[in-house]
Amino acid sequence: MSDPHDRSNRFELIAACDEETLAGFANEVLEDDPPLSIRQDPRPQLLMQQVQEPVERRPFNLGEVVVTPAEVELGGTRGFAMIPGKNERAALSGAIVDAAVAANHDRTPAIVESLRAADAQQRAKRRRSWAESRHTTVDFQTMEEQQ
């Protein structure tokens, strides 16, 4: 399980969280009207997705993907989020959530619990998807032995 208090893990958890949950927490954090400045407007952009080639372990540019980044400063604490696809609301909300957790806002325990639940749901979804496609795996060594 990923730790929402670790910033790298939190970035992944926020990116996987649904827009409504992020927006709800962002609105709750902003209820007290803390000082907020937007350091990077949420705007969709292209990002080169790089993977590691499995044979020689060299970096390989897989292609460009659309992401929406945003950065805020909330009461002196910076927050950042990068959401897959075009979703300005989720990116801005995610940046606010990141800043709130980093600053240990009153809503942090509820936010952390929700991020952990989203992580568990995503892991379960990946397991189901893998289980559904697993039977289509081809074992080339077995095929060679049969010839």
Identify the function of each model-found stretch:
Residues 13, 37, 45-47, 59-66, ...:
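Residue-level preference for alpha-helix termini and adjacent loops
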Residues 3, 32-34, 102-147:
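Cysteine/selenocysteine-centered motifs that mediate thiol-based redox chemistry or coordinate metal-sulfur cofactors
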Residues 12, 62, 77-78, 86-89, ...:
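Non-catalytic, beta-rich accessory domains that mediate macromolecular interactions or localization
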